Amino acid sequence: MKFIDEARIEVIAGQGGSGSASMRREKFIEFGGPDGGDGGKGGSVWATADRNINTLIDYRYAKTHTAKNGEPGRGADCYGRAGDDIELRMPVGTIISDYETGEPIADLTTHGERLCLAQGGVGGWGNIHFKSSTNRAPRQKTNGKEGERRKLKLELKVLADVGLLGMPNAGKSTLITAVSNARPKIADYPFTTLHPNLGVVRVGNERSFVIADIPGLIEGAAEGAGLGHRFLRHLQRTGVLLHLVDIAPFDENIDPVADAVAIVNELRKYDEALVEKPRWLVLNKVDMIPEEDRKKVVADFIKRFKWKGPVFEISALTGLGCDKLCYALQDYLDSVRRDRDDAEERAADPRYQDQAADKSPD
């Protein structure tokens, strides 16, 4: 399925039905009085997060979504039927904002999360509401209100635990194929990956994480060069970034250190928070370096790159070092989840709140 991560739509809620100005007409009842019912409420437009959907492609082609109008009221005190709501199912991770003002409206981060995008108009009043001691046969009624109408921008940020970044042909697609169930296109030319790929990595019966591969970055990506700039947003929600570097390029004129520095610079230009995110260095294609020279080449790279974080040496093609990398990632993600759960438990437990209050200065 083609991956679409951005769309623009218009949502139109239904108009409320008009009230009825009807009089009761019945044999042997001379002054029946008013019996006009109210109009029905217009249908609303709702958005629902669905984990079974992973693209916004449906909204690229169906751009206008209109709910039903409410039916008008009728005589005999009959109220009009309310218009049916419509439900727009969107991928988890969709950000909804106002297209004209840019104001954020919602961030659908949980499966089943539901939000009203456009409220249906209220129905008009029938003439039974205008009866009084001085007006026994009112002819007044009100029309239904217009439903809300909005132009919206939908933007999808994939929810993954691990994000891959690197230059084109660094081996990202090969790695995600080797360690997960994803099957992206792999070829020996730049920008083989044209859209993000998600894969599930399983390191045990009940232990797994989601990994995302985005198109390769090049220098100037933050300003729009290449393809990767369109997908950098997907890295903002990952728990850890794997910076993949081709340590043994075929072209001798390519400097792996310069490529690695360029990637970091592009992250900084796009979003400073991406640079601060936990990032691991993964040196790929180490099998292309003679074993007796491997240690020296890796040490020289780390020294020139001035890297002080975790380092993994792998070959995505042969699988060398991939298991070690996956288990380390799973252990790290598990520890982060435990810390987060403990923090949430403490925040919800009144005993910890009382302790914090006791320690606070008077």
From Swiss-Prot:
Question: What EC number(s) are associated with this protein in UniProt?
Answer: 3.6.5.-
Keyword annotations for this protein, in alphabetical order, are:
Cytoplasm, GTP-binding, Hydrolase, Magnesium, Metal-binding, Nucleotide-binding
Q: Which cofactor does it need?
A: Mg(2+)
Where's it found, cell-wise?
Cytoplasm
Q: Which HAMAP family match?
A: GTPase_Obg (MF_01454)
Name the job this protein performs: An essential GTPase which binds GTP, GDP and possibly (p)ppGpp with moderate affinity, with high nucleotide exchange rates and a fairly low GTP hydrolysis rate. Plays a role in control of the cell cycle, stress response, ribosome biogenesis and in those bacteria that undergo differentiation, in morphogenesis control.
Descriptive protein name? GTPase Obg
- Species per Swiss-Prot/TrEMBL record: Polynucleobacter asymbioticus (strain DSM 18221 / CIP 109841 / QLW-P1DMWA-1)
